[in-house]
UniProtKB/Swiss-Prot annotation:
Lineage, uppermost ranks: Eukaryota, Viridiplantae, Streptophyta, Embryophyta, Tracheophyta
Glycosylation sites: N47, N301
Metal-binding is among the record's keywords: yes
Assigned protein family: Belongs to the 7S seed storage protein family.
Residues annotated as site: Cleavage: N47, S48
GO molecular function annotation: copper ion binding; nutrient reservoir activity
Name used for this protein in its record: Vicilin Cor a 11.0101
Length: 448
């Protein structure tokens, strides 16, 4: 269907109609030519719009795609992908410069070699089942974890893990806060050989002989055998032993203490819930593991065709990782606008693995596609004292304004303003653009 008010089409038709020397057939042919030209022009404009959308995503410093990850570990049995520093493309995200994001992927029945990190780690099990073992002060603690579990790994703590599932891959999302070089972290492998290279190999043989009280030939054998990488296949017997064996007091979760053991985010009561979605939150005020990092972890499951927001955070910058599903997000940003005092719409398509960031104060909305639920894991930095301000639905900020303030701000009678902002009776999760149109009988698609 062509636009009703295409000025070029209207001008072309008038010209054909006014040409008196044309007979009726010629006028009809001329009209058809005008419409074909209008269609071509509309298609060109559409292609230009899509190119502009693609360019917008390329220049968007708030969105990170596959190409923004690098492989730190890659073996036949799994990999570790690390997101580039948040400030690599823009200083606009300098508030989270000392945080890094990584994703571990491991095949069924695999072993991830022992390592320690010069960073504080918080892990979220996005998929699968694992056993995570930490060595602390001459004792070992093991935790069986599953989908939805959050666990803290203190900086410098030796840690290793297994994917104890025989059929399902393991996916773990990690957020790291470096403690040595701001914005940079390293994994240090003690156990290993050539791949992963053991840090013991950096010392001279004389020093190692004296420290370990063994001969060089023995050292060369121990530190020269492993060459398969830091993620390797393990037998069923090894997996069974590492899932259950424990020295000292048993600490296999859920029998361990909450202060060091996992928190299952999805077992908590949702902080927001209706037919359009659910939000689960682990707040630092409620969980000791997250307090000193000033970090909140949340998980949103947005029903297909629905949306979360718009809203904004007062202090927290939200780092979001798409775990499952598809959709898109929109955010109002004053920093990328070409003129002062105005806002640019930041938007991007969302799919599994995409990372997007909403800084404090930036209004944002996240919309699920019509085909699948959209599941988003979020790490909120600077969470202490943060407030979430809704911009639509129950409790939205405009409804809290005084009547006179509404009239002065909008230059309209307050009843007209209230007719807009009091119409939505849901909170946080709402029907998305497509559902709204379907309910209104207007049809159309906002996103595919």
């Amino acid at each position: 269907m062509l636009p009703k008010e295409d000025p070029e089409l209207k001008k072309c038709k008038h010209k054909c109609r006014d040409e008196r020397q044309f007979d009726e057939q010629q006028r009809r042919d001329g009209k058809q030519i005008c419409e074909e030209k209008a269609r071509e022009r509309q298609q060109e404009e559409g292609n230009s719009s899509e190119e502009s959308y693609g360019k917008e995503q390329e220049e968007n410093p708030y969105v990170f795609q596959d190409e923004h990850f690098e492989s730190r570990v890659k073996t036949e049995e799994g990999r570790v992908q690390v997101l580039e520093n948040f400030t690599k493309r823009s200083r606009l995200l300098s508030g989270i410069e000392n945080f890094r994001l990584a994703i571990l992927e491991a095949n069924p029945h695999t072993f991830i070699s022992p390592a320690h990190f010069d960073a504080e780690l918080v892990l979220f099990v996005a998929k699968g089942r694992a056993t995570i073992t930490m060595v602390r002060e001459e004792k070992r603690e093991s935790f069986n974890v599953e989908h939805g579990d959050i666990i803290r790994i203190p900086a410098g703590t030796p840690v290793y893990m297994i994917n104890r599932d025989e059929n399902e891959k393991l996916f773990i999302v990690k957020i790291l806060q470096p403690v040595s070089a701001p914005g940079h972290f390293e994994a240090f492998y003690g156990a290993g050989g050539e791949d992963p290279e053991s840090f013991y190999r950096a010392f001279s043989w004389e020093v190692l002989e004296a420290a370990l009280k063994v001969r060089r030939e023995q050292l060369e054998k121990v530190f020269g055998e492993q060459s398969k990488g830091s993620i390797v296949k393990a037998s069923r017997e090894k997996i069974r032993a590492l899932s259950q064996h424990e020295e000292g007091p048993p600490r296999i979760w859920p029998f361990g203490g909450e202060s060091s053991g996992p928190i299952n985010l999805l077992h908590k009561h949702p902080s927001q819930s209706n037919q359009f979605g659910r939000l689960y939150e682990a707040h630092p005020d409620d969980h000791k593991q997250l307090q000193d990092l000033d970090l909140m972890v949340s998980f949103a499951n947005i029903t297909k065709g629905s949306m979360a927001g718009p809203y904004y955070n007062s202090r927290a910058t939200k780092i979001s990782v798409v775990v499952e599903g598809e959709g898109f997000f929109e955010m109002a940003c004053p920093h990328l606008s070409s003129s002062s005092g105005s806002y640019q719409k930041i938007s991007a398509r969302l799919r599994r693995g995409v990372v997007f960031v909403a800084p404090a104060g930036h209004p944002v909305a996240v919309i699920a596609s019509q085909n699948n639920n959209l599941q988003v894991l979020c790490f909120e930095v600077n969470a202490h004292g943060n407030s979430r301000f809704p911009l639509a639905g129950k409790g939205n900020i405009v409804n809290e304004f005084e009547r006179d303030a509404k009239e002065l701000a909008f230059n309209l009678p307050s009843r007209e303003v209230e007719r807009i902002f009091k119409n939505q009776d849901q909170a946080f999760f709402f029907p998305g653009p497509n559902k709204q149109q379907e309910e209104g009988g207007r049809g159309g698609r906002a996103f595919e």
